[in-house]
Swiss-Prot record:
Protein name (record): Sesterbrasiliatriene synthase PbSS
Motif annotated as NSE/DTE, chain positions: 238-246
Residues noted as binding Mg(2+) 4 in the record, renumbered to the chain: D492, D496
Organism from which the protein derives: Penicillium brasilianum
Residues engaged in binding Mg(2+) 2: D105, D109
Function comment: Bifunctional sesterterpene synthase that possesses both prenyl transferase and terpene cyclase activity, converting isopentenyl diphosphate and dimethylallyl diphosphate into geranylfarnesyl diphosphate (GFPP) and further converting GFPP into sesterbrasiliatriene.
Binding site for Mg(2+) 1: D105, D109
Gene: PbSS
Assembly and oligomerization: Hexamer.
InterPro entries to which the protein is assigned, alphabetical: Isoprenoid_synthase_dom_sf, Polyprenyl_synt, Polyprenyl_synt_CS
UniProt comment concerning the protein's domains: The conserved DDXXD motifs as well as the NSE/DTE motif are important for the catalytic activity, presumably through binding to Mg(2+).
Domain of life the protein comes from: Eukaryota
A GO term for molecular function: prenyltransferase activity
Amino acid sequence: MDFLSGAFHYSDSVNPSKYSPRPSDYFGTLPFRTSRFEREAADVTADYLRKWQKAVKADNPERKDLVFHGSTTTLGHFVSWAYPECIPDRVDLCTQICDFGFYWDDVTDSVNVQENAEITQDLALALLSELTLGQRLEPKLEINKIVVQMLWGVLDKDRKSGLEMIKFWKGHLDGQAESAHNNMSFEEYTKHRLSEVGARWAVEVGCWSLGINLSREKKDSVAHFVNKGLLAAALMNDYYSFNKEFDEHQRAGSMDRLQNGLGILMREYGYTETEARSILREEIRKGERAIMDGYIAWRESADSSSESHELNRYIVMIILMIGGITFWSSHASRYHRDDLITTAGDRAMIVGKFQCSMRLLDGYPPPNRWKSATSSNDISGRKRKSWSDSNGVDTHGACYTNGSSNRAKRNGTEAGHKANGHDSMDIYTAPFLKAPSEVCEAPYEYINSLQGKNMRNKFMDALNHWLCVPAPSMQIIKNIVQMLHNSSLMLDDIEDESPLRRGQPVAHTFYGISQTINSANFVYVKSVKETSRLKNPICMEIFTDELSNLHTGQSLDLYWRYHGRCPSINEYIMMVDNKTGGLFRLMLRLMEAESPAASSASLVKLLTLTGRYYQIRDDYLNLTSVEYTSKKGFCEDLDEGKFSLPLLHLLNHTRHPDRITAPLFNRASGARSLAREVKVHIIQAMDEAGTFEYAQGVLKYLHEEIMRTLDEVEADLGRNTEARILLLGLGL
């Protein structure tokens, strides 16, 4: 690490072997340093803990048994190792941020789901009021009052970096609230893990603490190797926290919410805890090697500009952060506990929980206890999703009983199809046999597996605070909306010739256009059957009405593109209300039909405005957001020739509309994408025409109207904190 010399001002290099005793469970390979302000951080932690304990007691006088495990260890302090180059006048707040993260988890992990939601909503409402409306509201709970005072200090010190940090923290909380990893492969888990773990939040804490100011685009330019290191940090957290997390979820009866790679390897793949830990250590080392190799390669190609210098600080900060947190985690009392009630024997109970569908982990042998059973199937020579055990689990996850395949039994006795070595004629007069739906549903299952923001379900839950729809009906409505949404995405991707959906290849890339269309139609049929299960007979009429609106709205969009006809703003809004707003109205009307409670006329307006906001924001971000580029491609709406609101504004405010429409609608035969240079020209033209400022103004106006309409609904139906948080969050 000699190439890092001279880059530090507030820390000293450290050799792990100098600590006595050296943590026996430490296996990190990345370097770390120690801050010269460790004593100050330790004093802040002691003071913050006293305040936090007092606040917890004030919020819940009955709670006496909660123990908090924060930053301080017998060998040092979390901040000293994680952020050794923290600017001295930010050490106080940086320490509070870190301890808050630990103590917040301790509190929320100790309460039930309802109490957790109340605590989170109380804090979220105060944060979003500041971030979107510029209003500083005081939370109800004492612990949240401590938190917001700390966060106001963060914003007052460095608002730009502070906002990024707070946004990532909120995303981390959202990810935790939504997560459940039952029946998930390790590969799928690792893809989700970065968005759920605090690693990205920890990076933004580091940027604020060190005063690093970089655009999202610059950060993303090194994400291809930085993310491998962050994934290693996430898995490292899983490695050290597993015993603690298992114990907490076992006590709470919430094992389905256990977010841990060790749990996945044990439950889904049948590995023992020892085997799973060995695999996780190897995956962590791979990630650590990858970030170091990536950094060295980047250094060799980087120039000497100030931007490269700042980016270098950013990468080095992350490397040292991962190295320091690994050392801290290897011995911190937060993870190495003597008060757990569960044992290794209890943890072993989840090994191979789903015996009939064990998975095979790429790059690793099956569990030792299955090697003898799998050797005869030559697993090592072929790639399979699962492996055979001696109790009759086939290599594709189907169960066997007494040596016979259930799949064969469903399809009839194979021996009956043969007579004297020839095909039997009986097959031609056999009874009707219903075809399995797996093949038909495969494209839908793929698109459904891609991680989205789940905003529609959140919105329905918020609406149900007012409408009180019975749980069975509510689940059916959620199923209907989910099926219609995802099937429409499959068709949209075909009609738009899109290459990506949520950052992954579109469904028809794997299944073909014809099969994907067939799957979408099949899901439409399933949604009709779901609607028939609702109690109010008017629900079917509502369903067909809004499904018709969805298609007529989409037809306008497709017609304008195909014929190169620029719509008016009024026509555009009509299209949005039918195409995008259709699902919002469908969910509301079905909920109202199944609800025993009174509704409000303003609810329809609220959802109509929300649908418009979503579409216009999507139009805007498609052309301006780095995140959208990574998930959909660079300015994909221009490739589609889509008449988005920014394009409408440009065509009405440029002196040379022909220079815009010509490349959009007069392409060479078979050319799907515009040349990057053409896209850049159009974006520059939008900049000059004030298009993006116009779109921002429309969104600001719509958001104000949404909040005003929410006030009207709350006047009719009562306060709804969940809905207010969701709608405030739109303005971020």
